[in-house]
Amino acid sequence: GECVVAGMGQERAHRAAQLLADRGARQLVSWGLAGALCPDLASGQLLCPAGVVDAQGRRYPVTTDLQAHCLEQVCLGAVTADLVTWHETLVEPEQKQALYRRTGARAVDMESVAIAQVARERNLEFVVLRVLFDPADRILPASILANTDPWGAVRLGGLVAALLRRPSDLLRLPGLARLARRSGQSLKAMADALPALNQDKNVDKEPNPL
């Protein structure tokens, strides 16, 4: 098995999935963070959805037996409701509510549909393993988002300048740090459980950057 770190966005995810398929992968796993669209979901919760939905409402179901195996071995108690892939980060609670009403999906990410499309084209098994980062009612600071690169690293110089222009965002940073710790702990716990999946499903958690 092999893991490719693709960065954020559908284009990067599609390239990574194609690369893995070209290298002989039999299963594709969409792994990372997601945002809540539904108010009953909390930061740090695990997601293993039954399907992913694109912006046009097309649904891509995951491989049922692979999902069941993940729910038993990797993410016991995970949320299994559908996830929607969107083209940008949703900053305001109103945006999240609108997408929830439009799609019925309970969570959102920026990559899974692209991976699902490659899995369908190449006849590969597919599953999603995600951790919720931001609750549906949480505002994400624009200064942070504008200065975060596709790999999730923050450009400190740009962030300082943005915070000087929007000092109110400073008040949101402690809460954002708590979300990062909570979701990071859940991601680590899920990663620690992956060897049980590797034994049967040939998934490797060692990253090879794209």
Set out the residue ranges of the language-model regions.
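Active-site rim beta-loop-alpha module in soluble metabolic enzymes
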Residues: 64-141, 145
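Generic structural signal for well-ordered, non-membrane alpha-helical segments
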Residues: 9-13, 63-67, 92, 108, ...
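Glycine/charged-rich beta-loop-alpha catalytic/anionic-binding loops adjacent to active sites
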Residues: 1-3, 53, 96-102, 170
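Intrinsically disordered, low-complexity terminal tails and inter-domain linkers enriched
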Residues: 199-207
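N-terminal hydrophobic/helix-forming segments and targeting peptides
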Residues: 70, 208-210
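Metabolite-binding pocket within alpha/beta catalytic cores that recognizes anionic/polar moieties
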Residues: 1-75, 83, 106, 121
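Regulatory input/activation interfaces that engage signals or partners
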Residues: 132-200
